[in-house]
């Protein structure tokens, strides 16, 4: 048995866990490509989500400003396609690199393969418990992009 944790911020254990507990603690944020109006950023699954949003804002990269203060780590964000105020993870998601729990092979999932929907993805159902994500590729605007619902 394996229990994979992100940051553990929404876990409440009421009894002993009869499993190997694996907490993803991979760190790293780096710009891997720059274009005229956007940048591609690789982010490790163990990075704190809100800290990633702040890092991007400090560099004037836009796209996920509305998703600040969402608890948890980057690695768990695609499971339910986190979102707030008209913006969702899928709006900046390009792909993620994963490791198969069954045979430890690597597999890259594109945005299309993740089948993002409202608070949903392939990792919440068909691929639940089958892969561990380690790195993500996101595309951000070179200036903040405000989406304000009035």
What is each PLM-predicted segment?
Residues 36, 62, 94, 139-142, ...:
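Compositionally biased, low-structure terminal segments
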Residues 1-92, 100-102:
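Anion-binding (especially nucleotide phosphate/pyrophosphate-binding) glycine-rich loop
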Residues 11, 106-150:
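Phosphate/pyrophosphate- and phosphate-bearing ligand-binding catalytic cores of soluble enzymes
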Residues 45, 68, 83, 94-100, ...:
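Short, structured patches in soluble enzyme cores that scaffold and shape functional sites
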């Amino acid at each position: 048995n394996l229990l994979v944790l992100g940051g553990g911020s929404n876990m409440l254990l009421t009894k002993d866990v009869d499993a190997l507990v694996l907490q993803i603690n991979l760190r790293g944020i780096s710009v891997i490509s720059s274009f005229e109006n956007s940048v591609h950023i690789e982010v490790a699954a163990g990075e704190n989500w809100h800290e990633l949003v702040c890092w991007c804002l400090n560099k004037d990269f836009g796209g996920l400003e509305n998703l600040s203060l969402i608890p948890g780590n980057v690695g768990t964000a695609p499971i339910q396609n986190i979102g707030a105020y008209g913006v969702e993870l899928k709006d900046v998601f390009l792909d993620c690199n994963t490791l198969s729990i069954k045979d430890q092979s690597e597999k890259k999932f594109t945005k299309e393969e993740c089948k993002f929907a409202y608070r949903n993805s392939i990792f919440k159902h068909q691929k639940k418990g089958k892969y561990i994500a380690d790195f993500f590729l996101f595309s951000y605007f070179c200036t903040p992009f405000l989406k304000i619902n009035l």
